[in-house]
A protein has these predicted regions:
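Extracytoplasmic/peripheral linker and loop segments enriched in polar/acidic and small residues
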Residues: 288-330
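Catalytic cores of large soluble enzymes that bind and process phosphate-bearing ligands
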Residues: 10, 51, 55, 222, ...
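Flexible, low-complexity junctional segments that flank or bridge functional domains
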Residues: 1-203, 254-258, 264, 312-342
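Conserved acidic, small-residue-rich alpha-beta core segments centered on
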Residues: 165-302
Length: 342
């Protein structure tokens, strides 16, 4: 049981603070099918009856859960996040298998979330987050070391996000022309009439040269936020194949606000769409080639997606051909005996 808070009006004031911030900023009520005023009518009386901070937090979590938004959470005074939604997604990244694969890859770990190596004669780059120590400079330096590689694997399966600017700037190293990477829709003040929504986000070529050889991006349900912006951008480029699973479907660019009694809460500020203008929120970004993740079907402790990526790069470089996918979802025979589905 939580410590009582006196007077109880302070709990109602916290409720009103959170509800009002969402009412002013959150862009996705209609998209999520949530009547926010109805939520207030249902949950404010319960906030009035709450007798402790913990009781209020329980009420707020219940009110926010129908948004099904991974960027909506509360933060306690110790800095621990309290989620309002947990997706039931299957991961396609097993760190034990990955570490086993990296032992054969001359892998150089710059940090837990960033490293590079060579797999099957192709450059490999693991990006586990878009935040320090991963930066535009560190990514540029890694790419410079891979400049002469016949192909590149970029692994972002387990990347939960970080700084959009870093992710999109890196995508600029793979294009020779400017293009629209995504669109974002934000709430605007009623007095602002000259801003047309959604806003286009454009990527331009960056750096003195661009990597235009074949690239495979490994994606999965563990990729969120800035990673989804990156995958959505990369999958439009002609030399890029996205392999794996659909991304997690959470791209909201949240801001953090004070709630009261040391608590804070987040409010997503935009609804993002891919270059095809389909929402990313709740849907994710699909791969070009979907590959089921059932490691029990594979020999030893290898990482099947990395093996499949090597096979794809071999095909792109004319080393060998991957058999076309059959009409039904049966495993496809490839040079690495890995199943791919178009």
């Amino acid at each position: 049981m939580g410590v009582p808070v006196a007077p109880s009006q302070s709990l109602v004031a916290q409720f009103d603070t959170l509800w009002t911030r969402f009412d002013e900023i959150y862009p996705s009520f209609a998209y999520k099918g949530v009547d926010w005023r109805a939520q207030r009518a249902t949950y404010r009386p319960r906030a009035q009856r709450a007798r402790s901070q913990d009781e209020l937090i329980g009420v707020l979590v219940e009110m926010l859960t129908p948004l099904r938004d991974l960027h909506v959470w509360l933060v306690d005074p110790r800095g621990q996040a309290v989620p309002t939604f947990r997706p039931a997604g299957l991961a396609n990244f097993d760190r034990t298998r990955w570490e086993s694969a990296m032992r054969d890859a001359s892998y150089l770990a710059h940090s837990r979330d960033f490293g590079e190596g060579m797999v099957g004669g192709y450059a490999y780059l693991y990006i586990g987050a878009w935040k320090d120590p991963v930066s535009q400079e560190s990514l540029d330096l890694a790419l410079a070391r891979m400049r002469d590689a016949p192909g590149l694997i970029i692994d972002v399966r387990s990347n939960p996000g970080g700084t959009d600017q870093t992710a999109l700037a890196f995508a600029g190293r793979f294009t020779t022309r400017a293009f629209t990477a995504s669109y974002v829709e934000i709430r605007t003040d009623s007095l602002v009439k000259d801003v047309e929504m959604p806003l286009a986000r454009t990527i331009s070529p960056r750096g003195g040269w661009q990597f235009t050889r074949p690239v495979v991006v490994l994606s999965g349900r563990g990729g969120f936020s800035a990673t989804e912006s990156f995958v959505a951008a990369m999958r439009t480029l002609p030399q890029v194949t996205v392999l794996g699973d659909t991304t997690g479907g959470a791209s909201g660019n949240p801001a953090t606000f004070a709630l009261g009694n040391g608590w804070r809460f987040t409010v997503p500020r935009w609804l993002e769409f891919g270059p095809d203008r389909r929402p990313i929120e709740g849907r994710g970004v699909a791969p070009h080639l979907a590959m089921s993740w059932d490691p029990t079907h594979y020999d030893g402790a290898r990482d099947p997606l990395i093996d499949a990526a090597v096979g794809l790069l071999g095909e792109r470089n004319g080393v060998y051909r991957i058999a076309p996918a059959p009409s039904r979802e049966a495993p496809v025979e490839t040079p690495t005996d890995r199943g791919l589905r178009r």
